[in-house]
A protein has these predicted regions:
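Histidine-acidic metal/acid-base catalytic patches
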Residues: 1-4, 11-24, 51-53, 92, ...
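Short, conserved active-site loops that position catalytic residues or coordinate cofactors/metal ions
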Residues: 24-33, 58-65, 100
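Residue-level detector of anion-binding/catalytic polar loops
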Residues: 27-28, 56, 94, 130, ...
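Conserved beta-strand positions in the central sheet of alpha/beta enzyme cores
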Residues: 30, 59-61, 97, 132, ...
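Glycine-rich, positively charged N-terminal anion/phosphate-binding segment
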Residues: 38-54
Length: 286
């Protein structure tokens, strides 16, 4: 399988981060909009650099607080989305991460959320863009991947799927076994992070204390096994928010991150949790 990493995991500017990712052997990256906004280079220049380094831009993120809102707010959200799609076209990527709404004015209505996500997906489809909907652990109402999937299924658009993040699922104690009920082709993206067992606010836990696979207390081998058995064939991607990693040498951290995926792939295979060992491309995880 291919490997990827979110640029938020690393210190420095976007160009330096991309060079470090390529040097460490990653196949692709998730570009954070804050990294792009802070870069001197244009989206076209970042796209060209990634091509030269042999990196694919697997996803652009995040887009927030879209669904479960009144019609006027949703119209504004569609305009925001269209501007985001412009940037994505310039970057040359076709997948956007959409986080579940955290706003206090969010309406608790799955039918409304599905209808609005469907309209967003239609707007995206006209631009050749796909949307990966993610249940944040602190989402106002959608904080469980199973509910996110129900909404996506209800919306019923080919370019709308889910993003599964190990932190958001395991930090809340949700059972990952039901991931296997989601069709593999509707799992648009997978984000992996470990974490220590802490009794604290989940938002602060997520933003400051995530770890690379093998460094925390989550059962990531079991989690990954469920995702692979569901039929997921996309990249194994790391999304690790950690204050220490964002202050340490970027090339060292990128290499450390890459090794953690090798460890996880080996552990998952050794535990017999992969349906077909050939699915893990050894050239991509050495």
């Amino acid at each position: 399988m291919r490997t990827s990493v979110a640029t938020v995991c690393l210190s420095g500017g976007l160009v330096e981060k991309l060079h470090a990712c390529a040097s460490a052997g990653f196949d692709g990256v998730e570009i954070m909009d804050a990294d792009l906004v802070g870069a001197y280079e244009s989206p076209e220049e970042i796209r060209t650099l990634c091509e030269r380094l042999g990196l694919t831009i697997d996803m652009f993120q995040p887009f927030r607080d879209v669904e479960g809102v009144d019609e006027q707010t949703f119209a504004d959200n569609l305009r925001r989305a269209d501007a985001k799609f412009d940037v994505m076209e310039r970057l040359g990527t076709d997948l956007m991460l959409l986080c579940s709404n955290v706003g206090t004015a969010t309406i608790d209505d799955d039918d409304l959320a599905a209808e609005q996500l469907g309209r967003l997906a239609d707007l995206a489809a006209a631009r050749g863009i796909r949307i990966a909907y993610e249940a944040l652990a602190w989402g106002r109402y959608v904080d469980d991947y199973r509910r996110a999937w129900r909404i996506v299924e209800k919306a019923d658009r080919p370019n709308l799927g889910v993003c599964l993040d190990s932190f958001h699922i395991l930090s809340r104690g949700h059972d990952p076994a039901e991931i296997e009920t989601i069709p593999g082709d509707k799992i648009f993206f997978l984000q992996l992070a470990d974490a220590p067992a802490l009794d604290m606010d989940v938002l602060q836990w997520s933003r400051h204390h995530r770890l690379f696979p093998g460094e925390g207390d989550f059962d990531l081998t079991g989690f990954l096994g469920h995702v692979l058995r569901a039929g997921y064939t996309g990249p194994l991607s790391l999304e690790v928010f950690n204050d220490t990693f964002r202050q340490t040498a970027v090339f060292r951290t990128a290499a450390h991150a890459r090794r953690s995926l090798t460890w996880l792939a080996d552990r998952t295979e050794d535990a017999g949790r992969v349906p077909d060992a050939e699915r893990l491309d050894r050239k991509s995880v050495v």
